[in-house]
């Protein structure tokens, strides 16, 4: 399964993140998919700090240990919270606009990367896929490659938080 890196012209989420970061305003991001119902996300929600996150996300961040991979990191809110806790995190996203914003916001290790890229390597004690992180699977037929990729990147005894 090869998910291409996005171009700015085909990156509405990255554009919304960049606009909100630059101007402090963006209304809602509408998400359409044949796999689930239409959804709306207030862009401001992507810029939450730790105390504004739901209890379940807070607990996942607290329980994250060792070398952490934040998949589909978006604006970097989870990575920033982890850094503030003194944890080591690598944030990846297929959106160049999102990665640029993460770096400007202070995420120390943010890179433009496709989770499914066989050349992407590393050994992570925790893999985070919060919010709609499992959406990268796209369809049931992609579950085997998804689990293969998790197994390849997850250190022995590691955990995945979704």
Segment roles from a protein language model:
Residues 1-30:
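N-terminal auxiliary segments of SAM/dcSAM-dependent transferases
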Residues 47-67:
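Conserved alpha-helix/loop element of class I SAM-dependent methyltransferases that forms part
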Residues 75:
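Conserved SAM/SAH-binding loop
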Residues 95-96:
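Conserved SAM/SAH-binding beta-strand->alpha-helix loop
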Residues 99-100:
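Short alpha-helix immediately C-terminal to the canonical SAM-binding loop
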Residues 106-117:
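Conserved SAM-binding strand-loop segment of SAM-dependent methyltransferases
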Residues 124-144:
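A short SAM/SAH-binding and catalytic strip from SAM-dependent methyltransferases
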Residues 142-156:
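A short glycine-rich, Lys/Arg-flanked "PGG" loop and its adjoining helix->strand segment in the class I
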């Amino acid at each position: 399964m090869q998910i291409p890196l996005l171009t700015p012209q085909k990156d509405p989420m990255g554009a919304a993140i960049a606009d909100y970061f630059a101007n402090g305003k963006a209304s809602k991001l509408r998400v359409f998919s044949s796999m689930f119902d239409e959804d709306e996300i207030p862009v401001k929600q992507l810029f939450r700090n730790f105390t504004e996150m739901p209890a379940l996300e807070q607990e996942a961040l607290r329980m994250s240990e060792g070398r952490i991979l934040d998949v589909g990191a978006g604006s970097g809110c989870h990575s920033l919270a982890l850094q503030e806790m003194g944890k080591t995190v690598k944030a990846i996203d297929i959106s160049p606009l999102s990665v640029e914003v993460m770096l400007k916001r202070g995420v120390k290790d943010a890179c433009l990367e496709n989770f499914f890229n066989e050349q992407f390597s590393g050994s992570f004690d925790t893999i985070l896929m919060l919010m709609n992180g499992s959406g990268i699977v796209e369809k049931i037929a992609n579950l085997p490659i998804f689990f293969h990729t998790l197994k390849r990147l997850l250190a022995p005894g590691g955990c995945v938080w979704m």
